[in-house]
Amino acid sequence: MIVANGGVDKIKGIGVGAPNGNYYNGTIEFAPNLPWKGVIPLAAMFEERLGIPTALTNDANAAAIGEMTYGAARGMKDFIMITLGTGVGSGIVINGQMVYGHDGFAGELGHTIIRRENGRICGCGRHGCLETYCSATGVARTAREFLTARTEPSLLRSIPAEEITSKDVYDAAVQGDKLAQDIFDFTGTILGEALADFIAFSSPEAIILFGGLAKSGDYILKPIQKAIDDNILTIYKLSLIHIS
């Protein structure tokens, strides 16, 4: 890529978006969904190897900046970015500025606890984190639980339980599979309830959903919107959900 862009001399800087990225330090720190452990000084490693100034931030923050500059959040000053992938990432923009907080990790909404008792274990080591229910991997976990607890026929029963993915659930839902549709209802309801709390925190103009799971469309969007509407104060009713 560097060669294709004319070599190192033509590149002014490198920007990296990564899970658990610390903008202040240029480090990836204790990322639960990456094989790297501890604190990784990735920006410094890039600079040492390539001699190019490098900035690093949380991947959801990077997505928020992208949406604010080029996408669904253009013209907005207050919004929340939610990335739905292997985990649940988030970036919070208030008055046109990213919120980083004291230590660079403000807005780890995927690690808010939404099940205090008997919650699923998370890669971070705690139990009941939002991302264990509302990420792509969380959807697969819900599918396995539903298939064990329920007896009705489902297209998902033809797939070995440990191989089920969120895309398998989506494909089954599109074909009218009731159990698959219920999985999305369950997931969307939990996410919508959490988003209602996030709305009360920053009163955003919009919440933008990004990532593979967000592409499930109305299967997940409708229960999200219903749960938000059922759980927020009337003063926040104008908050909108966008899918990027």
Stretch-by-stretch model annotation:
Residues 74-133:
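Glycine-rich phosphate-binding loop of actin/hexokinase-like ATP-binding domains
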Residues 1-13, 23-27, 43-54, 69-76, ...:
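ATP-binding/phosphotransfer module of carbohydrate and carboxylate kinases, centering on a glycine-rich
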Residues 56-60:
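Short loop/edge segments at beta-strand edges and connector loops
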Residues 19-22, 85-87, 213:
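Short glycine-rich anion-binding loops that position phosphate/pyrophosphate groups of nucleotides
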Residues 64:
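Acidic/histidine-rich catalytic cores of soluble enzymes
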Residues 28-35:
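Short glycine-enriched, charge-decorated loop/helix-capping segments at active-site entrances
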